Curated annotation (Swiss-Prot):
UniProt: Ca(2+) 3 binding residues: 94, 96, 98, 100, 105
Lineage: Eukaryota, Sar, Alveolata, Apicomplexa, Aconoidasida
This protein's record includes keyword Acetylation: yes
Subcellular location: Cytoplasm
Protein name: Calmodulin
Length: 149
């Protein structure tokens, strides 16, 4: 399944993997997974984190390596996000709950993920998704952006 990914997708997933792999050792542990999820406003229990790791950990060593991560991401792409998942993702970004993702909200979430973006990069991301030109991203624009990926 992972062999059906484009080079661009693999490159993007490598970047995402490195956000999780905080110590850069090539594996994601439950501790690293928990850190990223908490930075996104989730609060998983140790058991939930272990379940997530076990679901992806095909070689049974207790951690996720990049090939296992790619398999998961390929599966996620194939399953295309359900509306519920999209709403949940939108809420992570829309911190004040006003129905719009502002540049500040986008910058905050990306910084929590360890992505240090310049103001120009944040503005560019907003511009790319902002169909109606109001300077922020509404739910409809967010869905179009996520489906287009």
């Amino acid at each position: 399944m992972a062999d059906k990914l484009t080079e661009e997708q693999i490159s993007e997933f490598k970047e995402a993997f490195s956000l999780f792999d905080k110590d850069g050792d090539g594996t994601i542990t439950t501790k690293e997974l928990g850190t990223v999820m908490r930075s996104l406003g989730q609060n998983p229990t140790e058991a939930e984190l272990q379940d997530m790791i076990n679901e992806i950990d095909t070689d049974g060593n207790g951690t996720i390596d990049f090939p296992e991560f790619l398999t998961l991401m390929a599966r996620k792409l194939k399953d295309t996000d359900t509306e519920e998942e999209l709403i949940e993702a939108f809420r992570v970004f829309d911190r004040d709950g006003d129905g719009y993702i502002s540049a500040d909200e986008l910058r905050h979430v990306m910084t929590n993920l360890g992505e240090k973006l310049t103001n120009e990069e944040v503005d560019e991301m907003i511009r790319e998704a902002d169909i109606d030109g109001d300077g922020q991203i509404n739910y409809e624009e967010f869905v179009k952006m996520m489906i287009a990926k």
